Amino acid sequence: MIKILCSADWHIILHKKKVPYDWQVNRFREMFRKLIALEQSCDVHIIAGDIFDKKPEPDEICLFLSYINSVTIPTYIIPGNHEATKKGESFFEYFTQENAIKNENVHVYTRNGRASVGEANFCFFPYGEMQNNNLPQYVGGDILVTHIRGEVPPHVSPEYDFSRLAPWRLCLLGDLHFNHRYGDTDCYYPGSPLNTTFDRDANRQYGVDI
């Protein structure tokens, strides 16, 4: 059986006001060290969007590349809403250009697509495709990877009809920052591995999924 490492919502940002720069860099580097350690016992790493908090600065890109060019297992990335430039588009398109990422283990999907790792088949449904209502066709046995905001009562409403994802036996999602199964669906959020601008809730779990 394949072992999947799933993370999302890193929100790399290095220029928050009144926060020491070195501290901001070092917490991401520590996260990268832990991810590299975790991948040693996994077969594939799925990153379900929002790696960056906004359009990145050069040092934020370099920090990301320092990790992504070091991964040792197949790693698949889709963009999330924080990487969108306009409806249906993402600045992650630039990372798909030749030599942008030099690690052959890394694959970026800014459009719908499929990939196989061992006996597992993945279907990628990036945020921009969700915005354009371009749900991919279901293929039996696929694991869906997407980035969609679900409901968090009483103030956060879902941005998509989750019943449309029902054919997939497993859905790995980014967007919501706490680790949980979404209702009675087969959709799972790993949550954000690091604190963001949102406060932590002591009654919820955070991190990554394996």
Residue ranges and their predicted role:
Residues 151-210:
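Conserved beta-sheet core of the metallophosphoesterase superfamily
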